[in-house]
Swiss-Prot record:
One of its GO terms (biological process) is translation. The gene is rpsO. The keyword Acyltransferase does not apply. Pfam families: Ribosomal_S15. This is Small ribosomal subunit protein uS15. One of its GO terms (cellular component) is cytosolic small ribosomal subunit.
Length: 89
């Protein structure tokens, strides 16, 4: 249940420094957030899919670690990213 190529390209263009910047922290967090939102829609239909839920928890944990790193590295960009992604932090 990964994101489509076009969705990834749009996220990279929106949050990256250029169209090929898929490795920066902001882009990684945005991609993980999109994948989490996609999986939440999946779980609305498939409530008993516990194997995928474990994968979701792994992705959420990875995003949380990246958010902590990004907050310590660049607070201004962190707050901007949180507002753009509508996260509750």
């Amino acid at each position: 249940m990964s994101l489509s190529f076009n969705t990834k390209a749009k996220i990279i263009a929106d949050f990256g420094r250029n169209n090929y910047d898929s490795g920066s922290t902001a882009v990684q967090i945005a991609l993980l957030t999109a994948q989490i939102n996609h999986l939440q829609d999946h779980f609305a239909v498939h409530k008993k899919d516990h194997h995928s839920r474990r994968g979701l928890l792994r992705i959420v944990s990875q995003r949380r670690k990246l958010l902590v790193y990004f907050k310590n590295k660049d607070l201004a960009s962190y707050t901007d990213l949180i507002e753009r992604l509508n996260l509750r932090r």
